[in-house]
Regions:
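Periplasmic-binding protein-like
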Residues: 38, 42-63
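Extracytoplasmic small-molecule ligand-binding "clamshell" domains
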Residues: 49-54, 58, 78-155
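A ligand-binding cleft/hinge motif common to bilobed small-molecule-binding domains
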Residues: 1-21, 138, 154-164
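A short acidic, helix-capping loop that chelates divalent metal ions and anchors anionic groups
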Residues: 26, 100-105, 161-162
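Structural transition elements
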Residues: 69-79
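Hydrophobic/proline-rich hinge and linker segments of small-molecule sensing/allosteric domains
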Residues: 27-30, 92-96, 166
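A bilobed periplasmic-binding-protein/Venus flytrap-type ligand-binding module shared by bacterial periplasmic
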Residues: 18-42
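Local pocket/hinge segments that shape ligand/substrate recognition
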Residues: 19, 56-71
């Protein structure tokens, strides 16, 4: 056997047929924020009217969609993030460039699955949507200091994230 033939005999097969893990992705709001239920309601409505599927297909992420549970917005009586956002007139979304979730088009505008869904939430709130590039390692601090209102960027919902954000 030649060297190449011998190598092929011992070539490793790195193909796995089993799924090793399942990751869940989502947006992150401040702990106790009523913005969480507003986003959940908006996502549920977008699923019901077909908007969620259409946006997912536009960016090729439809296989990642999960069923959105029915959700009704519950406003906080004290320290409402929704009221705060409406008062200032802007939903500030913390992102990083992460296609197909958030990235810039040829004109420098933010697009992507998460960017489009964040714009939909801002539209439902009746406010402008502003995207701010954040240092990913400081995302919780950015939220807590109100530099941003939501982290929305293909974020894996780890135990650490779930403990620090809604």
């Amino acid at each position: 056997l030649s060297y190449q033939d011998k190598f092929k005999l011992y070539e490793p097969d790195l193909t796995l047929g089993d799924m090793l893990t399942e990751e869940k992705y989502g947006a992150g709001c401040r702990v106790g924020s009523d913005l969480t239920s507003f986003i959940n309601q908006t996502m549920y409505e977008a699923q019901q009217d077909g908007t969620l599927q259409a946006v997912a297909e536009k960016y090729g992420v439809q296989a990642s969609l999960v069923e959105q549970p029915e959700s009704v917005f519950a406003a906080s009586e004290a320290d409402s993030d929704v009221a705060y956002i409406k008062d200032k007139g802007t939903l500030v979304v913390g992102i990083t460039e992460f296609a197909p979730m958030d990235y810039k088009d040829e004109n420098g505008n933010w697009i992507g699955f998460d960017a489009d869904m964040a714009r939909l939430v801002a539209e439902k709130l009746g406010v402008a949507c502003e995207f701010v590039v954040i240092d990913w390692d400081l995302k919780i601090m950015e939220l807590d200091s109100k530099s941003i209102d939501v982290v929305w960027n293909g974020m894996t919902l780890t135990q650490g994230v779930l403990a620090a954000m809604n």
